[in-house]
Amino acid sequence: MDSLPDAVVQYILSTINNAKDVASCNCVSKKWKDSMPYIKSLYFPRSIFDSLKNGQTSDCVVMQIVSSTFQLEDLVVYCPFTSAGMASWLLVVGSSLKNLELRMDNLVEQNAPNDSNPSKLDCIQAARNLESLRLWGVLMVNAPKWDVFQNLQNLEIVGARLEDLALAEALRATPNLIHLVLLGCEGLRTVWIELLQLEHCKLDFYGSGSCLLTLRAPKIEYLEVQGCSLIRVRETNSLKNLSLANNAGRVYMVDFGKLMALESLSIRGVQWCWDAINKMLQLASEVKHLYMKVEFTGDFEALLPFPEIDFVDFFKSHPKLKIFDIHGAMFAALCQKNSLKNVDSSFMIPCLEEVAVTVRSPLNAEQKMNTLESLVKFGKKLKKLKIKILGMKSGHSSADDFFEEICRLRYKNHRLISIE
């Protein structure tokens, strides 16, 4: 092994990052051991220290391996560690780290941090040159003691208990973020995010679905929000992909700027106020991909059906629509208004290529069949129409007749229509 060229040894070591493998390489030969300091990436799996002996602790072993490196750039620690242990090894390698990923495991309240016993979040300050930070299982009820992370472009927090002010202070310390992900975060009520460089943002707030969100990010291109009842995003000139969902609560209001660049819109949830849905559909007139799965409307506790939607007006208002995925209530609303009997002969749906329709009920079967037939008739570029009936209520006497009509339509257009 000592006779291997340096370039070969360095290439082999560049493919190794598991801490157990790195430690084993120390035993291969003197040349390999001497090359250990040049390892750039280390990964400590969750169960790596399950069988420690002789009084060893995970903190000590992590410190031993980390301190043997020089200019470490990537560090991933999923195994258990203490704040004191974390402070010691970040003191050694923090200045060279570019990417840090930690499984914090501190969702429960612990002793209040102080100068002699800083919290795990406070310790991250030692890695001041970070470009990417990923944290799992975070307790952030107090603002972390961070200076500004000027180089940090990617921040991801998964599974967290947060307070509004603590999150606001943390984001104030990361002004140059381009990519922000907050998943499975609970405890938030009013969220204010102002990040002038932000382009990609994914927010998933766990709880009652009543969170209020205000986002100021003039460069935002991709935005995904789950769990908010009020959403305000005024600077949207660059926004191309937008997904809004609330699986637990009700969406009362949306306040967006012009969505002229929007290509994809997804609206999901149990209940949305109709004004919010209608406003999004009006703003998204240039959208190419529209996904709608909202079960009910209504401003208060009562769950109401969708009002009637004019088929012709809808497609005239969305001339660039290429992919349309429509579920139950919205499809029923699109069928109710009797606008298909006197359609202008020049009417066509110019860009529509793919449609997926979820049929939940056989009621108003004739209108629904007219709508399906109209999609085929007026969709001049239509390539695929998928009709999903797996969840259709079959107890009604007309269910079998309706299904036969759908099968007949498929038989006439077997290259175009599929039934799921």
Question: Where would I find each of the regions flagged by the language model?
Answer:
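Leucine-rich repeat
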Residues: 3-11, 15-186, 192-194, ...
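A generic structural motif
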Residues: 102-105, 292-296, 326, 385-392, ...
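Canonical position 11/12 of the leucine-rich repeat
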Residues: 140, 162, 187-188, 208, ...
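Acidic, glycine-rich loop-and-beta core segments that form the ion-binding/anion-interacting portion
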Residues: 208-209, 213-268
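C-terminal effector modules
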Residues: 376-420
